[in-house]
């Protein structure tokens, strides 16, 4: 077993503040996987749902799911940033269900688990996703002020 793959096994960077480095860390893990010649995929949650919806509408959802499932590392960024409609929630749930115990998954979010029911529009579906994540997962919390705010050109004064 590759220790790098073990490192990213279901990592969940979480911090209820923007600009603390969650996406940066997820991108770095994706790049590291690629440097190790491991297939990796990086999506925002909303772009992944749009991609899956388009594939389904074009009759190629199984093929798209297979392509996503081939990646050793799957990054889903900004989960909960935009709400999911019921159809999108079901499509995203299927990605989590397919990835469970087969792929390493990194999810970035600003939301605590208690708020995921609102994201998926269904408390039971959210609970099933959370159950799969926490089984083998690691929660990584980011603290501090926003990097973008700290380094903003537009400052008070």
Locate predicted features.
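Pre-Walker A adenine-sensing motif
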Residues: 1-5
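Walker A (P-loop) ATP-phosphate-binding motif of ABC ATPase nucleotide-binding domains
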Residues: 11
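Hydrophobic anchor at the beta1->P-loop junction of P-loop NTPases
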Residues: 14
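The conserved Walker
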Residues: 18
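Conserved lysine of the Walker
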Residues: 22
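Hydrophobic positions on the alpha1 helix immediately C-terminal to the Walker A/P-loop
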Residues: 25, 29
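Short, well-ordered alpha-helices that flank and scaffold nucleotide-derived cofactor binding pockets
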Residues: 31, 35, 54
